[in-house]
């Protein structure tokens, strides 16, 4: 009879630990991160009264998956994981002059597309 009480106690403690850990996690999806959607955001540094300057900001997607063997054979330096991502970039923009003579892009529409920060 004592062995049943020990098993019941172990099960009860395990259940309580599980419930405690479940309630300690914030509400929402486990994979969701605090990153807003891709949209226009005012650039406070370059904006002036009456002439706001906007830039695209926010999250798109990224993923990683195993590189197919057929593709690895064609690589000069084979890698096991292939990653793919898209960035929040300007779909349309206009040129604007701020602070006298500094030319910047004033974004007018955003979308998720190829990341350009590494393509100089």
UniProtKB/Swiss-Prot annotation:
Pfam family, one: Hormone_6
Gene3D superfamilies in the record: Cystine-knot cytokines
Record localization: Secreted
Disulfide-linked positions: 35-59, 38-88, 56-110, 60-112, 87-115
Signal peptide start-end: 1-24
GO BP terms in the entry: G protein-coupled receptor signaling pathway; positive regulation of steroid biosynthetic process; regulation of signaling receptor activity; thyroid hormone generation
GO molecular function, one term: follicle-stimulating hormone activity
Domain of life: Eukaryota
Keyword terms of this UniProt record: Disulfide bond, Glycoprotein, Hormone, Secreted, Signal
InterPro entries, per the entry: Cystine-knot_cytokine, Glyco_hormone
GO cellular component: extracellular space; follicle-stimulating hormone complex
Glycosylation sites: 80, 106
Subunit structure: Heterodimer. The active hormones thyrotropin, lutropin, follitropin and choriogonadotropin are heterodimers composed of CGA, a common alpha chain described here and a unique beta chain which confers their biological specificity to the hormones: TSHB for thyrotropin, LHB for lutropin, FSHB for follitropin and choriogonadotropin subunit beta/CGB for choriogonadotropin.
Task performed by this protein: Shared alpha chain of the active heterodimeric glycoprotein hormones thyrotropin/thyroid stimulating hormone/TSH, lutropin/luteinizing hormone/LH, follitropin/follicle stimulating hormone/FSH and choriogonadotropin/CG. These hormones bind specific receptors on target cells that in turn activate downstream signaling pathways.
Family: Belongs to the glycoprotein hormones subunit alpha family.
Protein name, as recorded: Glycoprotein hormones alpha chain
Species the sequence originates in: Aotus nancymaae
Designated gene of the protein: CGA
């Amino acid at each position: 009879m004592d062995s049943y009480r020990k098993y019941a106690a172990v099960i009860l403690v395990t259940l309580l630990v599980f419930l405690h850990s479940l309630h300690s996690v914030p509400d929402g999806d486990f994979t969701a991160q605090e990153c807003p959607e891709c949209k226009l955001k005012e650039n406070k540094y370059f904006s002036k009264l009456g002439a706001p300057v906007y830039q695209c900001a926010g999250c798109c997607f990224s993923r990683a998956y195993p590189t197919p063997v057929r593709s690895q054979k064609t690589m000069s330096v084979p890698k096991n994981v292939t990653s793919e991502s898209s960035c929040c970039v300007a779909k349309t923009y206009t040129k604007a002059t701020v602070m006298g003579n500094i030319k910047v892009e004033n974004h007018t529409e955003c979308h998720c597309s190829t990341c350009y920060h590494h393509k100089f």
